[in-house]
């Protein structure tokens, strides 16, 4: 029987960030702050692939396609790696494709995206695979990865600030501040993406850019 297990990810409530934003944007409704925060995290995740989910999949005899859906209100951005898993050792990575039309080729293992959903095709039955996914939050997300607060707090806040200041006809509206925070967010995304590729060896990326007043 097929077995799909998602590794647990440490989480924190959105309030950890919302408390800071509500102090800065005192006239903003809570729902607007929450929406801006989720949108900012999703943008950052798409640009950097810093939000990951690890899946262990054991294939079932006669079944070729497997749908991988994170259980924590996350959407899959991309499959980052797939390896055969033997206890504590990995073999791979395996060949990956992005078109279901290619699924008849002679490669042993194929991964592709079908209608916006991640599908895993593994002809070898009874084999366990370790799959790493890049993900982003959906609108229903009520918690976020604790790594965002530990490593990318200012990046997330700057992303939310850029969206909030860009809103028209608000007491706090300021295109100048919105553009400044957007540039700061983009610089932070570039740094975070490099840090993620290096395995977070450079340490936390917090408050690397000056605040905008």
Model-derived features: where do they sit?
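The Skp1-binding helix-loop-helix core of N-terminal F-box domains in SCF E3 ubiquitin ligase adaptors
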Residues: 22-28
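Internal mixed-charge
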Residues: 1-19, 31, 35, 39-46, ...
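Divalent metal-cofactor coordination and adjacent catalytic microenvironments
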Residues: 36-101, 150-165
């Amino acid at each position: 029987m097929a077995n799909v297990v998602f590794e647990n990810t440490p989480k924190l409530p959105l309030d950890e960030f919302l408390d800071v934003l509500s102090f800065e944007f005192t006239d903003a409704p809570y729902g607007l702050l929450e929406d801006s925060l989720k949108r900012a995290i999703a943008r950052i995740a798409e640009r950097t692939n810093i939000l990951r989910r690890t899946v262990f999949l054991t294939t079932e005899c006669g079944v070729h396609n497997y749908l991988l859906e994170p259980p924590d209100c996350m959407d899959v951005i991309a499959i980052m790696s797939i390896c055969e898993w033997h206890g504590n050792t990995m073999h791979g990575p395996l060949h990956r494709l992005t078109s279901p039309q290619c699924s008849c080729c002679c490669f042993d293992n194929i991964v592709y995206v079908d209608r916006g959903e991640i599908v895993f095709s593994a002809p070898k039955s009874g084999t366990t695979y370790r799959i790493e996914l890049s993900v982003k939050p959906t609108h229903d997300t009520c918690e976020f990865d604790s790594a965002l607060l530990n490593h990318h707090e200012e990046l997330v806040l700057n992303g939310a600030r850029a969206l909030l200041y860009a809103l028209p006809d608000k007491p706090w509206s300021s295109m100048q501040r919105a553009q400044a925070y957007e540039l700061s967010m983009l610089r932070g995304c570039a740094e975070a993406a490099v840090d993620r590729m290096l395995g977070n060896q450079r340490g936390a990326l917090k408050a690397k850019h000056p605040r905008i007043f």
